[in-house]
Structure formats: C-alpha cells, structure tokens
Amino acid sequence: MKYTTIVFDCDGTLLNTATDLANAVNHVLRTHNFPEKSLAEVKAALGNAVTYLMRQCLPSTVADHELEPYIEEFKAYYGEHLKDTTAPYPGILDMLDELREQGYKLAIVSNKIQEGVTPLNKEYFGDRLPVAIGERPGLQRKPAPDMVLQALKELNSPPEESIYVGDSEVDVATAENSGLLCIGVTWGFREESLHQELGVTHIAQKADDILSIIETLNK
C-alpha cells in the first residue's frame, strides 16, 4: 500500500461547524453593539484559527492589540455552544469506517483550539480518529507543517505515505508545506474553483469520492 495514513481537516471537511461558529462570533459582536456578520462572511474568515477569525469580523476600530478580550469571549461562548447545530457532513462517518476497516491510520489536524477539537472528536467520531491535533502552545498552526508532523509522529507514519484532506487554501498550503499529497473537498467553506486555481488535482465532491481517489492512488 503506497498510502497508509489519512489526515483530515475538521471544520468544513469532517464537520459542518459554520453556524455554531457564526453564532459565537455574533454573540461577541452583539455584546459590544458591533454590526453582526452573515453566515457567508463568517465562513469566508474560517480556516486560519480564532485570532484571524475575530480580526476579520471585528470592526477596524478595534486595534490588533485589543483583540484578546474578544477572543476570550468567543472561546467562552463557543465552548458552551459548539454542538448546538454542528454535525458531520453526509457520508463522513461511513467513509471513516471504511477507511479504518481497510487498515488506514486516521487523524484530525485543525486550526480550531484543542479545547474545541477534543470534545467534538469524541462526540461525533468516537474512536475513529485516535489522533486529534488542534491549536495548542508549542505548535505553529497551519499552514506551517508542525501540527501535521506531530500527528504523523503519533501515528508513526512518514509524510510520503500520508494524504491531507481539507476544504480551504490553508489546507492546500498545509499539505504542500508538510510534504503530503492533498485531496480537496468541495462541500466545506470554499468553492471548488479555489482548488482548481491552486492546482489541486484530486478533488472530492462527496465523501465517497475520498475512498475512490485513495483506492486509485494505491493501485
């Protein structure tokens, strides 16, 4: 088997978290009498961790050095509401079960804070994804390779045997920086045209496509 390990992004790839994230953003904005953001506006800012998300959604009158209290408010609210509407995308659980049955090693690597990744992984995926890396001290977040390489270390897998699956430009860059082949998915927070523009050659339009792409790659 040429590829033995599949590493997944979380938000926009495995889980549709957009509404819960948007609700948390808008809770902070409402609290401070700032204009709220649409779901589309929040989705466009997702993928690059919470500091970037809040920078994009807060007014420019809030200086960069003033962001931290708003970030903490977001984290507190989201921590209590991260499972209100979140759910796996169609076919994801069956796809993960099939990969696991075929003997693939599986992991999540996400720019979501570790305090979000851990409970969501446990709630929705059980033991399907034994390694789940979120934003934490000591690891540079995506698109730096650190988080992916940490996951591969825990799985005892080399990059050349591993595939990264994600929905955004951050994921494409992460795969490249980590030395992994990339599969782009079109059901998340970005359009299919983005993957085409970035030169992604393996694009999944539904969860089953991930299985068929991997099967073809391993022939």
Task: Label each PLM-derived region with a short phrase.
Residues 2-94, 102, 118:
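N-terminal helical cap/lid subdomain that shapes the substrate entry/recognition surface
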Residues 13, 110-112:
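Conserved phosphate-coupling serine/threonine residues in phosphotransfer and NTP-handling enzymes
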Residues 84-87, 113-163, 169-178, 192-196:
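Substrate-recognition "cap/lid" segment bordering the active-site pocket of phosphatases
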Residues 186:
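Nucleotide-sugar donor-binding loop of glycosyltransferases
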Residues 202-206:
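Short acidic-hydrophobic, aromatic-tinged amphipathic segments that line or gate anion-handling sites
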Residues 93-100, 172-176:
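Surface-exposed amphipathic alpha-helices with a cationic face
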